[in-house]
Amino acid sequence: MYSFELDKLKIELKTWEHDFIDKNKREPTRDDIKSLRTVRQMYKQYSTLKKKQSLQRQKVDTQESVELPAHKKDHDEVVEIGPTPQVYGKAISIFDMNLSPIKPIYMTFTNNIDVNNDNSKTISNESSPRKTILLKSSPADRTLVAEPISSVKRQLNFQMLNASSTRTPTSSPCKNRNGKLVEIKKCSPTINPPLESGKPSGYYGPNSPLKLDEENIHLNISLNSSTKRRLQIAYPSLQKTPSKDQADISTSFSPSPLIRRPLTKSLIELAREHTEIVKEFGVLQEEDIEEEEEGEEGENGYDEKNHEDDFGLEDELIRPKVVKDIFQEDDDNDDSQAREDTFIRKRPKRRKVIRRLRDNDPETETAGFERDVHKELVKLKRRKVAEFLGSTSQISDTEFEHDPEASSGVVSSEQKPTAKRKGRKKYNLVSNNFRRLKLPKKNRFSNGRWGRR
């Protein structure tokens, strides 16, 4: 309502202020506004409208903040319980589940007695309230009364121990046979508990230390168990020589909080493992010696060159791996030193090589000289031409002078340059891929764009 007039006045005042600044090059003051009557009235009108608008907004805010009273409906509504957790038709979150459900208390009234009379009311709080309702009264005479909601959380009450609130109790409360706490008596380790021979195990609390005496719990360790060896190490007085019957007892055990067992193996177990390792190494050494003897017998049929290669390996000698028994006496050390002095020849792996058979006959070796066919043909042509012209002596002499190798007709293999073998290239070039995969090149068509296909 007032917003339109306020906006209009604000525009007029701003236009006058800007005109005054452009004209006088300064902002208008109060004296300038008071001197002009029309401008002064516009400012007064603007201030009054502004106050009215603020008062109107405050009234609207107060009306919105007033809460309407909730009117309870007289008739009951049909409530459909959905899958969400609810208590009597009202949805609750999972964080409100610590509240126990409301326990109904059914009240029945006797016939022909006033409902308002308290003496005529009887409360049935039994485990099955529905049965009592059907037997005692009709639905018209029954009313439902709800108890206040109680929390599930329990609180410990140590007032029965007659201890101060600032002091923590040092003993657990006793219980009678029915499970109720005894307020007068205390259960302390120094005083004998009031326990008879036929009392149940629930007489004390679950964490009471006196429960051990009641149940007669003792720790018995049998000497035939798997922990005997651990105990002998921990207590030297229990150490005895192990018998043959107990030699094969399993050493597996479960961790116990009462007995500290060493995690390492015992000396007897280490000695057994050592003897087994010594036996295995002895068998392996015997097998190696047998294989070497068989190899020496087979090497007798080889040629002299192979024998020279074998004799060249005598420098590569190794000492045998001799496992020393730490449990043997010092008398056996001489035998072990004698074994260490022995040498075993290391036989390397050989590769089968097929060699060409060599013949030492000098006649067959000299007969294999190579001849140049082209030079032989040139020499024959020159002879035929010389015979036809009749000057065989002159041509043959000049031929022998300029070409002494052609006169003999033999080309020495030593003077002929041997073709160098091209080594394998380190990198595969891109051009090799073009040649191998038959890829098109840049200048593949000499005659125009399209060539022969």
Curated annotation (Swiss-Prot):
GO terms for molecular function: DNA replication origin binding; single-stranded DNA binding. The keyword S-adenosyl-L-methionine does not apply. It is found in: Nucleus. Residues 418-427, 435-453 have a biased composition (Basic residues). Its main location: nucleus. InterPro entries: DNA_rep_checkpnt_protein, Sld2. Residues 285-301 have a biased composition (Acidic residues). One of its GO terms (biological process) is negative regulation of protein-containing complex assembly. GO terms for cellular component: cytoplasm; DNA replication preinitiation complex; nucleus. Residues 284-345, 391-453 are annotated as: Disordered. Changing T241A: Reduced interaction with DPB11. Interacts with DPB11. Has a role in the initiation of DNA replication. Required at S-phase checkpoint. Also required for the proper activation of RAD53 in response to DNA damage and replication blocks. Present with 656 molecules/cell in log phase SD medium. This is DNA replication regulator SLD2. It comes from Saccharomyces cerevisiae (strain ATCC 204508 / S288c) (Baker's yeast). The gene is SLD2.
